[in-house]
């Protein structure tokens, strides 16, 4: 990963398209790496990674691959099955 590949201007659009505003408030935008926005949950400290069209991504080594949003949201937010997740 090179310094030029890291974006430092926040982009909330992908997260706002997936979650209600009160749930977006649970995250901090951290950085963009190769088109993937990295949002850190304020309680769990886990990352939710979304690309520009809202696909949820996971990191494996230096690569990203797509994963189901609902599953990742539950893990990142610490919510369990059956809890209200208010996905937009």
Please identify what each model-predicted range represents:
Residues 24-71:
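Acidic, low-complexity, intrinsically disordered interaction modules
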């Amino acid at each position: 990963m090179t310094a030029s590949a890291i974006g430092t201007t926040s982009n909330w659009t992908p997260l706002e398209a997936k979650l209600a505003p009160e749930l977006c408030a649970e995250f901090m935008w951290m950085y963009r790496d190769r088109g993937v926005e990295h949002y850190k949950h304020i309680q769990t400290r886990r990352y939710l990674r979304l690309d520009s069209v809202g696909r949820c991504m996971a990191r494996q080594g230096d690569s990203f691959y797509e994963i189901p949003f609902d599953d990742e949201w539950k893990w990142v937010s610490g919510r369990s099955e059956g809890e209200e997740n208010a996905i937009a």
